[in-house]
From Swiss-Prot:
Pfam families: KH_dom-like, MMR_HSR1. It comes from Sinorhizobium fredii (strain NBRC 101917 / NGR234). Residues 381-465 form the KH-like domain. GTPase that plays an essential role in the late steps of ribosome biogenesis. GO terms for molecular function: GTP binding. CDD domains: EngA1, EngA2. GTP 2 binds at residues 211-218, 258-262, 323-326. GTP 1 binds at residues 9-16, 56-60, 119-122. The keyword Transcription regulation does not apply. This is GTPase Der. The keyword Lyase does not apply. Belongs to the TRAFAC class TrmE-Era-EngA-EngB-Septin-like GTPase superfamily. EngA (Der) GTPase family. Residues 3-167, 205-380 form the EngA-type G domain. It comes from the Bacteria.
Amino acid sequence: MSFTVAIVGRPNVGKSTLFNRLVGKKLALVDDTPGVTRDRRPGDAKLVDLKFRIIDTAGLEQSAPDSLQGRMWAQTEQAIDEADLSLFVIDAKAGLTPADETLAEMLRRRGKPVIVVANKSEARGSDGGFYDAFTLGLGEPCPISAEHGQGMLDLRDAIVAALGEERAFPPREDVAETDVDIRPAGAGGGEDEESEPAYDKTKPLRVAIVGRPNAGKSTLINRFLGEDRLLTGPEAGITRDSISVEWEWRGRTIKMFDTAGMRRKAKVQEKLEKLSVADALRAIRFAETVVIIFDATIPFEKQDLQIVDLVLREGRAAVLAFNKWDLVEDWQAVLADLREKTERLLPQARGIRAVPISGHTGYGLDRLMQAIIETDKVWNRRISTARLNRWLESQQVQHPPPAVSGRRLKLKYMTQVKARPPGFMISCTRPEAVPESYVRYLINGLRNDFDMPGVPIRVHFRAADNPFESKARKRR
């Protein structure tokens, strides 16, 4: 991206609506409730022929530094310092307020380029607010409607004028040519097409951090990053949007998603909380590995188990992190109890990796990252058809399929049809009659014999092809 733009303003003036308009997606939560946005959210924006990085910020209201509003103010100030330009959004319909004037003074002191954006200018009676914006002393305001997309061309021209042509349109870097493999797919230089592909260690890994409110999700991510990137505090439910951050661990790019705390469905009444939970669910579906944060001082609440079940039903790789380990006293006894409960209460995730950590002190974070990488390897694993069919034969010798209605089931052929998560197809007689207990037997066998702990495994059955069926039809 060529430059960075911060969107700032008091609460409920349409900052997140403008952010969504510029990134071309509904990434930020939008609601009539003031103060929806709390953390700063980055995104890749496109405005006509401009491409740039943009940061959505919390609505600015001066408060005590230790209060939630004060910590939100500090986050927004950091975004302004990172940016090359600020879009100062005002509500042209409502007109200027003392809070707008306070923000204008703060932006003037920063000494960076500022564009006053008079949003909601399509509304009747917005002219007064537009002309009042001249009194802020930050230049000519740019009238727009973020909701309807009006005034975007004028905003583009204002950005170019504020930054200058050279900064707004940096020269393109020449991309060096690289050798390209032009062999057709499958021409692997004599390699067996059934060989199991190696794990790609260079691919960025998407990780979602989920859990109940106040389990320490944002604190954990801040510890990974080594900075107070996300708002934290004793208040439950601080995080509302699913915020993504990128960093590197041992040369591997990690894209980590902080999510809103997920309460029991019956307790979620407010529209805004429902939007936050829906955003967290989207983050789970977009992620590859999901870290479920348990509070080690009160683990295995009913909601914890429901979150694990949700993650596995979505087909994601899961890792458990028992946070706040620094508050545990008899840690050996607690650890033994947690391991026993993990095996007993989560039979659908047998062998799931569970790591005691402390987001506050940093204890166990290296082991947690190793568990994430190892679980992702299993989630991506592919097994050759030859190995699977040898395994299927041995499983039937050890435990033959049961007879249903006096007729023995026959499992004839097995292959892996997908990874992420591992999915297998077995050709058999009467697939609809295979008992659930025998399906579990096969899944547990796959998990143990091919070392696939803690990831969801899908096994499907289909009717075996009958080679005599076509001849029988011809006779008819």
